[in-house]
A protein has these predicted regions:
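Conserved nucleotide-binding/hydrolysis micro-motifs of P-loop NTPases
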Residues: 11-13, 34-37, 65-69, 92-96, ...
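Generic hydrophobic/aromatic pocket-lining and core-packing "Φ" positions
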Residues: 18, 76, 101-102
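Conserved ATPase-coupling elements of RecA-like P-loop NTPase cores
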Residues: 37-43, 71-73, 97-100
């Protein structure tokens, strides 16, 4: 992925950056710079900063794959004010237990759009696929032929479908 990284401190900065990139970009990712998901004051400020016309077309909530079920439910609830429909799951290489994550997201009707594997988030970001998760479940006996017939042929290196 060829990505530029910029920093916005306020709504004017964000508006300028959005206007710069919107016409020529498939995606614009915004990181909340590591604030606690329990910091309601910061979440309120973020809501104000993200108030840029046409910007909230697709908002993804991001969290680590190893996040526990109770914490994940809390994070999803606290950020619900942003109206996100899908999530980005990072650090998928740091766990082999995805059951709680998938269960909580299913209960909340949230889809996994993207995943990352490794410390180089931008370099390892890929579209999430059912095949990737099936291949990475602990103690799951995989029938690759059946999965590939149902979901498509996956790239052996990335797990992404062609």
């Amino acid at each position: 992925m060829d990505l530029d990284v910029d920093q916005a401190q306020n709504v004017d900065d964000l508006k300028t950056l959005y206007e710069r990139y919107a016409a020529n970009s498939d995606y614009i990712f915004i990181d909340s710079a590591g604030y606690s998901p329990n910091d309601s004051v910061h979440i309120g400020k973020m809501r104000t900063v993200f108030n840029v016309k046409n910007m909230n077309e697709s908002i993804y909530l991001t969290f680590a794959a190893g996040t526990g079920a109770r914490d994940l439910e809390n994070i999803l609830r606290n950020y619900d004010v942003f109206g996100y429909k899908s999530v980005i799951v990072t650090k998928c290489d740091e766990t082999t237990s995805f059951g709680q994550l998938i269960s909580v997201l299913s209960q909340k009707d949230k889809k996994i759009a993207w995943i990352t594997t490794g410390q180089d988030v931008l370099g390892t970001m890929q579209k999430a696929t059912a095949a990737w998760f099936l291949k990475n479940l602990t103690e799951f006996k995989i029938d690759t032929d059946t999965i590939e017939k149902k979901y498509g042929i996956a790239d052996k290196e990335t797990g992404s479908l062609f």
